[in-house]
A protein has these predicted regions:
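N-terminal "mature head" segments of proteins
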Residues: 1-147
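Hydrophilic extracytoplasmic domains
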Residues: 17-49, 281-406
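Structural signature of eukaryotic scaffold interfaces centered on beta-propeller domains
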Residues: 45-58, 103-113, 164-175, 182, ...
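Surface-exposed loop and turn segments in beta-propeller and other repeat-based domains
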Residues: 72-100, 149-160, 208-227, 275-286, ...
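Non-cytosolic head/periplasmic domains of membrane-anchored proteins
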Residues: 93-207
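Short regulatory "switch" loops immediately downstream of catalytic or recognition motifs
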Residues: 120-125, 175-184, 243-250, 347-356, ...
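Glycine-rich, flexible loop segments associated with nucleotide phosphate handling
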Residues: 131-136, 190-195, 257-263, 361-369
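Acidic, serine/threonine- and glycine-rich low-complexity intrinsically disordered segments
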Residues: 162-336
């Protein structure tokens, strides 16, 4: 009987804690400022596809804030278990609700006119401490809405302590799944690998496991694998870029990169060719540009502010050459953080999160929309803060987390 009483008490404490959290959130939300976007130049219609994700910092609480296309503000208390869906996931859910159940990571999808494919990794650890990893695979034939789904074990799963899906492509009825794997080790050595798994959808099995890159290092040396931001992660792509960043952690705890030891690589799915991009020519694609770039599988777009002005540079991935360099009509400030989206033949450029001596200011965020080819400004605007409680307004921080475009 005592055991049941203890269980009941624990449940009541948990429910009371959750209830207290939501009461605090609800009471604080009523006094929070709201935000809209004020048009400075151009047509308001350019905002129809824009959504700005942000947060308000109120003491120890963070309130999600969404400034959507009609310039209204949506503030809501965040659930302990909620997921923030973006436009791309929302569209897939609305079009294929049954297939999308339980699937919410855009990097795990592939979509063309005929098929919607999905491949994710489920990682669990056994009692012995080894990882038990499975591919969760699904394919939807859009024509007849026929769904196929299955799970298969990751080859040599006992070697790995962590796996992450980078890219999914459907080529000749086989899924190509590119992953970054951390190898388990019993000594001081650490190993990171990039794997390409080929999954035969008809046989429901992994028919190939190719290690594209393997790097072994020992502390204080460090190695990181990175990929540029993919602005269209679910679309068919024949090429993917990734970088190997090497560095060292000094005794004082400071980290120093080793640019000469780091490199940029490209992998071509159709030719199965792995190439090191050297960037030897002036104004050609290189490691520094790719690390801060945005790619759509054909081009890489990078923001450059070294001249004291914002420039959007476009590089052709196949030739590695600079094909366009346009100046953006927005004042440059090195204390600003920038967010970029490339879509609809436009560049959407948002700057904000300005800091003064490491303190976040409440300065307005600036939004620019320009034609991707000509650089012509189509829209300029800025966020406007509407205080609900002027007495406490300056104590509330505003932080931008993402820029989304339909």
């Amino acid at each position: 009987m005592k055991r049941y009483i203890c269980s009941i008490i624990i449940c009541l404490v948990v429910l009371l804690s959750i209830g207290t959290y939501y009461v605090k959130v609800a009471s604080s939300a009523s006094g929070l400022p709201t935000y809209t976007i004020k048009t400075i130049e151009g047509s308001d219609k350019e905002l129809d596809s824009v959504r700005v994700h942000a947060a308000l910092e109120v003491g120890n609480f963070y309130e999600p804030l969404m400034i959507d296309s009609n310039r209204n503000t949506n503030i809501r208390g965040r659930s302990f278990w909620s997921d923030e869906f973006d436009y791309r996931i929302e569209r897939l859910v609305s079009e294929h609700r049954s297939f999308m159940r339980g699937k919410d990571v855009i990097d795990s999808f592939y979509e063309d006119a005929d098929f919607l494919a999905y491949a994710s990794l489920n990682n669990e650890y056994t009692k012995s401490g080894k990882m038990n990893a499975e591919f969760d695979v699904a394919l939807l034939d859009k024509k007849d809405e026929d769904e196929t789904s299955f799970r298969i074990a990751v080859p040599d799963q006992g070697r790995f302590m962590n796996t992450e899906v980078w890219d999914v492509q459907l080529i000749h009825s086989k899924l190509q799944v590119l992953t970054m794997n951390d190898v388990d080790s019993n000594d001081d050595k650490q190993t990171k690998e990039v794997h390409l798994y080929t999954i035969d959808l008809a046989k429901k099995e992994v028919v190939s496991d190719r290690t594209l890159v393997s790097e072994t290092f020992t502390y204080p040396d460090q190695v990181e694998f990175n990929i540029p931001v993919d602005i269209s992660p679910s679309q068919p792509n024949n090429m993917i870029l990734f970088s190997i960043i090497k560095g060292v952690t000094h005794e004082e705890g400071d980290y120093e990169e080793k640019p000469k030891d780091s490199k940029l690589l490209s992998y071509q799915y159709d030719t199965e060719k792995l190439t090191t991009i050297k960037g030897a020519k002036k104004e050609s694609l290189n490691l520094d540009i790719a690390r801060s770039g945005y790619t759509d599988g054909k081009n890489l777009y990078a923001i450059d502010g070294t001249s004291g002005k914002y420039h959007l540079k476009t590089f052709d991935l196949s030739s590695e050459a600079l094909t366009n360099d346009m100046e953006l009509d927005l004042a440059f400030n090195k204390r600003d953080e920038n967010f970029v989206a490339i879509k609809n033949g436009r560049v959407y450029f948002l700057v904000g999160n300005r800091r003064e001596k490491e303190t976040l200011t409440n300065d307005p965020a600036q939004l620019l929309i320009a034609d991707l080819k000509t650089g012509k400004t189509l829209y300029k605007g800025e966020t406007v803060r509407h205080a609900a409680d002027k007495k406490n307004d300056q104590k509330i921080g505003f932080y931008i987390s993402n820029l989304e475009v339909k």
